[in-house]
Amino acid sequence: MRRIVTLLVLGGALTLSQAAYTKADRIKDMQQMAKAMEEIQTGFFYNNNDLVQEGALRLSDAIRRTQPPLEEVEEKDPMARYMNNKIKLSNKIKKKIDQKARIIIERFRDGDPTQAAQAYTNILKKCMECHVQIRQW
């Protein structure tokens, strides 16, 4: 009986500690992504593999933390939820950016900066796609 109560208390504490993903969290993650992109670009200009790798890893870490806007996740109306594909689109963009970040690391390390720069450009396109379609720029 004590074990059950202990597990319930711990489970409740863990649930409460994982607060909802807020707009402030998203802004912080977006700023970290911007810094990571700057770091990758600086690494390209100075032909510095360490900067490129660190920036790509930082970008990958930040993109994994981002989540869809809370108001879309908590949508109560089933029809609006069905018609709204922003959650699916943002998850798809996250996956693509993460893949391209890995490509940047691999290509630049292997001595193919042209392909690494192309992956960087594709990440920028995905960022703009998200900001135009989801964030309504």
Label each PLM-derived region with a short phrase.
Residues 1-4:
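Positively charged n-region of N-terminal signal peptides that target proteins for export
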Residues 6-15:
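Bacterial N-terminal signal peptides
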Residues 19-20, 137:
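Generic detector of bulky aromatic hydrophobic side chains
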Residues 20-122:
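Extracytoplasmic c-type cytochrome modules immediately beyond a signal peptide or single-pass transmembrane anchor
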Residues 123-135:
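The canonical Cys-X-X-Cys-His
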